[in-house]
Amino acid sequence: MPEQIDGNKLDLEERVVTINRVAKVVKGGRRFRFTALVVVGDKNGHVGFGTGKAQEVPDAIRKAVEDAKKNMVFVPTVDTTIPHTVVGHFGGGEILLKPASAGSGVTAGGPVRAVLELAGVADVSSKSLGSNTPINMVRATIDGIKQLKNAEDVAKLRGKTVEELLG
């Protein structure tokens, strides 16, 4: 189990992915609230996402940022890209993440781009398979990131050195 990352100790940048107005129907009519989906990252291998709900948009965003700081994950990278191809799943959302050559940039749509850019991955290609709901795409991307392993981790799991592994 990886250690918990303290988001309060990092210099984080935040990006609002989506804001949604939701309604609760009561006897006197509708009561509106706002939900916010926010991604935070230090562009140096740490990224997290959070959701918040409140009567006003700024409060929802503040709550989402606090939640995101509690849900940080580490992103292993090789130079400016990810170590290997991976598919992340969540609900109906599925995201294919592939390493890309240097200078390619982040080839990804909306929510996935926000997660990858704030994670500090400069070159990656992605494809959304299935649901394109922002929350499902963000969660599927985070799931894919959690599956990533660098050469040192794989060598340790197999009981070999990195040189033996890479040939």
From Swiss-Prot:
Ranges where the S5 DRBM domain occurs: 12-75
Any single GO BP term: translation
Disulfide cysteine pairs (residue numbers): none
Keyword terms of this UniProt record: Ribonucleoprotein, Ribosomal protein, RNA-binding, rRNA-binding
A Gene Ontology cellular-component term: small ribosomal subunit
InterPro entries, sorted: Ribosomal_Su5_D2-typ_SF (IPR020568), Ribosomal_uS5 (IPR000851), Ribosomal_uS5_bac-type (IPR005712), Ribosomal_uS5_C (IPR005324), Ribosomal_uS5_N (IPR013810), Ribosomal_uS5_N_CS (IPR018192), Ribsml_uS5_D2-typ_fold_subgr (IPR014721)
GO function terms (MF aspect): rRNA binding; structural constituent of ribosome
Record carries keyword Mitochondrion: no
Family per similarity comment: Belongs to the universal ribosomal protein uS5 family.
Annotated domain remarks: The N-terminal domain interacts with the head of the 30S subunit; the C-terminal domain interacts with the body and contacts protein S4. The interaction surface between S4 and S5 is involved in control of translational fidelity.
Subunit description: Part of the 30S ribosomal subunit. Contacts proteins S4 and S8.
Known function: With S4 and S12 plays an important role in translational accuracy. Located at the back of the 30S subunit body where it stabilizes the conformation of the head with respect to the body.
Protein name: Small ribosomal subunit protein uS5
Gene: rpsE
